[in-house]
């Protein structure tokens, strides 16, 4: 059997190529998997579980069809879909996991997370993350009218784009010491995460122990899937479908 991992799809109505690749993946690959893990940023931005647009319903239906077929789906919130909550999970049958958690992957303990919490050198982002994850603020936001939410999100997205233009790639990448600290904290030799859009498999040592960090790819120009079996793992690409 195969366990699949994806992240950073940034699904949005304007990118039909990404959506179609995702749908084909769900129907042709994920349906045959032992489990599917989505490690955040499934959406370009998820405003709230009350989203009932045709696009949101289409994505819900794909997950519902997959879980109904018997394939468990596990989700970790990313920095763009941290408002995805229990209502979405109930409607689709997926399971929401903690921001950082460990799983048993064919006999090996593995730590999985979105990855933004590893980018501790980006102080401005970490402060922003701390703010938007406050429960009282999310409680208020969930009760704001939909049209106002959209305006707020549009303004935030504009600010994020402007901010990124003035940051170095190093600041937006993970901090290696933080990676080692988290792996040591959870007593694991393998970490899987997304967020940085830098797909790769990193092998390194810490305290004389061989460690591995797998970085999932984004879906901006092609699909990216991590396939794990009892025999090993492979980070693979999936081409977009063209007319």
UniProtKB/Swiss-Prot annotation:
Topology term for the membrane: Peripheral membrane protein
Keywords associated with the record: Cell inner membrane, Cell membrane, Hydrolase, Lipid A biosynthesis, Lipid biosynthesis, Lipid metabolism, Manganese, Membrane, Metal-binding
Keyword hit for Cell membrane: yes
Keyword Membrane: yes
Originating gene: lpxH
Catalysis performed (reactions): UDP-2-N,3-O-bis[(3R)-3-hydroxytetradecanoyl]-alpha-D-glucosamine + H2O = 2-N,3-O-bis[(3R)-3-hydroxytetradecanoyl]-alpha-D-glucosaminyl 1-phosphate + UMP + 2 H(+)
Lineage: Bacteria, Pseudomonadati, Pseudomonadota, Gammaproteobacteria, Vibrionales
One cellular component term from this protein's GO annotations in UniProt: cytoplasm
Natural source organism: Vibrio vulnificus (strain CMCP6)
Top EC class for this record: hydrolase
Compartment list: Cell inner membrane
Pathway in which the depicted protein is active: Glycolipid biosynthesis; lipid IV(A) biosynthesis; lipid IV(A) from (3R)-3-hydroxytetradecanoyl-[acyl-carrier-protein] and UDP-N-acetyl-alpha-D-glucosamine: step 4/6
Residues given in the record as Mn(2+) 2 binding sites: 41, 79, 114, 195
Annotated positions binding Mn(2+) 1: 8, 10, 41, 197
Principal location listed in the UniProt entry: membrane
Official protein name in the record: UDP-2,3-diacylglucosamine hydrolase
